[in-house]
Amino acid sequence: MLTRRITLGISRNLSRGALINARFASSQSYLDSVANLKKDLKKAMIAKDDLRKTTIRGLLSGIKNKEIDAQGKDLDEFALHDLYSKLITQRKDSIEEFLKNNRSDLVEREESEIEIIKNYLGQLPVASEAEIDAKVSNLLTELKQSNPSLQLKDAFKKVDWKAAPSDWRASASMIKASIVRQFKTKS
């Protein structure tokens, strides 16, 4: 029994160390965003703004879960963008369900949470979906001019995936989704 406790204690300490290292390896804008959330949480607690406090705690919880899942990998503003977008989508789905069940009080709360999350989403130094779509559209137009029988896999090969996130200010998943969307409409 004693060895079991010692083993569990060591594994807990190692996982905490990995989590701390994940934070230090993250980008500066990621760290600034998390610090801003914590500062805003404190302000919401002082102002007794329950809705904002609960929403920010949910965001911080999602970020913490993302850090744990990353297991030491670098996290950046694109990971936050994906997380915030996912949370907004979840709330929109909840609104649909609440409308079906005539729960207007919960609909208003979810809409307010969406506005709070969109505020933090807008603060991230990430390109908007329209900006990404415009760049992808230009890229596909150039590629189709040089090769009229362009396939989707060829379009993916032409993108420098190591440099694209920093050059385009977008995550690879956002760029890939835009390429697929634009390719279908241009074909």
From Swiss-Prot:
<dbReference type="GO" id="GO:0016884">
    <property type="term" value="F:carbon-nitrogen ligase activity, with glutamine as amido-N-donor"/>
</dbReference>
<keyword id="KW-0809">Transit peptide</keyword>
<dbReference type="InterPro" id="IPR042184">
    <property type="entry name" value="YqeY/Aim41_N"/>
</dbReference>
<dbReference type="InterPro" id="IPR019004">
    <property type="entry name" value="YqeY/Aim41"/>
</dbReference>
<feature type="transit peptide" description="Mitochondrion">
    <location>
        <begin position="1"/>
        <end position="24"/>
    </location>
</feature>
<dbReference type="Pfam" id="PF09424">
    <property type="entry name" value="YqeY"/>
</dbReference>
<dbReference type="GO" id="GO:0005739">
    <property type="term" value="C:mitochondrion"/>
</dbReference>
<protein>
    <recommendedName>
        <fullName>Altered inheritance of mitochondria protein 41, mitochondrial</fullName>
    </recommendedName>
</protein>
<dbReference type="InterPro" id="IPR003789">
    <property type="entry name" value="Asn/Gln_tRNA_amidoTrase-B-like"/>
</dbReference>
<keyword id="KW-0496">Mitochondrion</keyword>
<comment type="similarity">
    <text>Belongs to the AIM41 family.</text>
</comment>
